[in-house]
Amino acid sequence: MNYLNKIRIENPLTICYTNDVVKNFTANGLLSIGASPAMSEAPEEAEEFYKVAQALLINIGTLTAQNEQDIIAIAQTANEAGLPIVFDPVAVGASTYRKQFCKLLLKSAKVSVIKGNASEILALIDDTATMKGTDSDANLDAVAIAKKAYAIYKTAIVITGKEDVIVQDNKAIVLANGSPLLARVTGAGCLLGGVIAGFLFRETEPDIEALIEAVSVFNIAAEVAAENENCGGPGTFSPLLLDTLYHLNETTYQQRIRIQEVE
């Protein structure tokens, strides 16, 4: 857990432009791993913040016409500052409006990581793809989708699901940790986007090992939380997840990580 240990020592400032539903949970999750979250949204202060920040999360869960230009502006400011961006195109396939905005953002700024479920990433590479919501997934080939997205956007791809797929540096990794309860908590996937950002340390071309550790730390913590005798369902799972992120140690991490490199 080299990256998590570094986070716990250095408390990296992680800027989160995220959706209104998940701000509190995302901030608390980042605090639990040792990062310092800032839920800053004003383009007017971005230049100053981004000089000292370590990464920026952009999550479009509550995209509106009023915040479109702000998102483009902060992404471009992050590029100018050399700040890595984790982009979470929430429900991109649910509407033409979302898809058009995501395409515009990806043309207007360079992101370091695109993170979403298989349907969301498919919607970014296939104009005919649609989805029913943020958790839609129709038995898609996540590895193939991730590889194609990586080839198109030339950026790291993280696809979440029953198994998670990471493609970066022309490598494809499948991770098999996690808990079904993650799908029963609004904002769990959004928090993962923030966690990934917390692991980047101003690396605009992140090492695949940082991405593997970020996703695995989150999902192993979810497993441990779900197995806790005090976990009775989604309501008790959420705080236990935060507690487990806070306490996770190297022994548990190494014993539980399930990882496979694929062709």
UniProtKB/Swiss-Prot annotation:
Metal-binding is among the record's keywords: yes
The UniProt record lists the keyword 4Fe-4S: no
Top-level taxon of the source organism: Bacteria
Enzyme class per UniProt: transferase
CDD domains: THZ_kinase
Pathway: Cofactor biosynthesis; thiamine diphosphate biosynthesis; 4-methyl-5-(2-phosphoethyl)-thiazole from 5-(2-hydroxyethyl)-4-methylthiazole: step 1/1
Short name of one Pfam family: HK
Amino acids binding substrate: M39, G187
Catalytic activity entry: 5-(2-hydroxyethyl)-4-methylthiazole + ATP = 4-methyl-5-(2-phosphooxyethyl)-thiazole + ADP + H(+)
Residues the record lists as binding ATP: K115, T160
Cofactor(s) the record lists: Mg(2+)
E.C. number: 2.7.1.50
GO biological process, one term: thiamine biosynthetic process
Molecular function in Gene Ontology: ATP binding; hydroxyethylthiazole kinase activity; magnesium ion binding
Keywords from the UniProt entry: ATP-binding, Kinase, Magnesium, Metal-binding, Nucleotide-binding, Thiamine biosynthesis, Transferase
Family as reported in the entry's similarity comment: Belongs to the Thz kinase family.
Entry-linked HAMAP family: Thz_kinase
Function comment: Catalyzes the phosphorylation of the hydroxyl group of 4-methyl-5-beta-hydroxyethylthiazole (THZ).
Name listed for the protein in its UniProt record: Hydroxyethylthiazole kinase
UniProt gene name: thiM
